[in-house]
Amino acid sequence: MIENQVPFYLLIFLVGIGLGVLTFWAYHRFALGGFKRISKDIISRAEQETSELRKTNELSLKQKQVEYQRELEQMWQQERKKLQQEEERLKQREDKLESRMNLVEKKLSDTEKREAILIGRKAQLDEEKKQTIESHSKLLSILEKASGLTSSEAKEILLSRLSNEVKTESANLIRRIRKEAEEEAEKIASTIIATSINRLAVSCASESTVCTVTIPNEDMKGRIIGREGRNIRALERETGVNFIIDDTPGAVVLSGFDPVRKHIAKMALTELVQDGRIHPTRIEEVVEKATINVHKQIKQYGEDAALRAGAMNLHPDLINLLGKLKFRFSYGQNVLDHSLEVSHLMGLMAAELGLDIRLAKRIGLLHDLGKAVTHEIEGSHAIIGHDLALKLGENKEVANGIGCHHHEMAPLTIEADLCSAADAISASREGARIEAVEEYIKRLRKLEEIALEFAGVDKAYAMQAGREIRIVVLPDQVDDAGVVNLARDLTKRIEQELSYPGKIKVTVIREKRVVEYAV
């Protein structure tokens, strides 16, 4: 049975092989033909797109070429326009140069003509000069024969007369110019000073080397003295002030030349009297406490003064020195009040003159700084103040204003000059200062002595409490021109040798009297 089925399976196998070969042939034929068609379609579309892209690029290139040609045309037109403008400008310059050349040639021609005329005139003048010299020689010879004098002798006589006339005229001219300048300066200065003083209001204070402390009863005097005087000795030792206990009812007198110590002593004694406990140990405690309080007051006085004057960023030591000025007096005038007054005056005058107001007020506030330490450092208070200001951080302008306010150094700024004026105004105003009688008499005598030292001075009188000096000269020794010179020289001597508030008027009198007797 199996043998009968083998041919059948073989037949089926052969049929399968045949169908497979037929299928492969059919697939290969139809599939290969489809792929070729697809590839042809792709190639065709690619060629079409390439053609369209080439046409588009050619069109874009033509458009860009047209635009570029248009831009080149515009640039060429612009360059051509610029060249035309430059050509026009050069042509105008050539025309101007040509006109200038013509003008120069014309001027040159005129100059040559003038030069020729001048040469002719020079020759003519030389001839006239020669004739004039000859005529002068002849006239001089005739004059010498007629006068009996040589030309040199005549010149000496003429020069002598002219010299005297010139001296007289120059003295008169100097007197007139100086008078006019003084009047004008007086007007301007009076206006500025009057404006400043009218805007200034200050209080007056007087110096005193003694002060009193009120006590409740006479028994307190004994307690202050203490057993065998130990309490009063402790007070004087701790404070450095003399305690005067006499018959003055209800008061103890404190005497001392250091105002700070005197103030400390007054505060300490006042507290001791109020407390009632008075013995050496308690005295030491109270004096130490009073010293601390006074130093706090000094600092407060300095800060208040700086604030009132608008002086910012002062060194702490400068503030303490300013505070000490509250306890110092000059001719009865409180130095700190005087410094504030000078600062205010300088600020007002600086405003009138258009100067630096802050600098002026700062100089005015610090100008008497040296008076706070004059008992500790040798030298004038102006120079001491100058050195202290530089040492404590002030600039050269401020230090110079301090140092030159008594003319001990040259001023560097106008504000420094203002300090001298404001200081004199503050010192010389009514009631500002009180001068001791001995100093007053000494100053008057010195004023008259200086005047009598000049040659030709007959008499000298100090008038108006030393505000004026009147001088009578000998008319035979001093002429009118010499009167002016004498007044000027005497003024300089007074400024150099005397110290005085305000100003001194110098009046020179020359009077010639001729007396004859009829017999």
Curated annotation (Swiss-Prot):
Gene Ontology molecular function: RNA binding; RNA endonuclease activity
PROSITE patterns, per database record: HD (PS51831), KH_TYPE_1 (PS50084)
Sequence ranges assigned to domain HD in this UniProt record: 335-428
SMART domains for the chain: HDc, KH
CDD domains registered for this protein in UniProt: HDc, KH-I_RNaseY
EC identifiers of the protein: 3.1.-.-
GO biological process: mRNA catabolic process
Compartments (UniProt record): Cell membrane
GO cellular component: plasma membrane
Topology relative to the membrane: Single-pass membrane protein
Membrane-spanning parts: 6-26
Job description of the protein: Endoribonuclease that initiates mRNA decay.
PANTHER family assigned: RIBONUCLEASE Y
Name recorded for this polypeptide: Ribonuclease Y
Record organism: Protochlamydia amoebophila (strain UWE25)
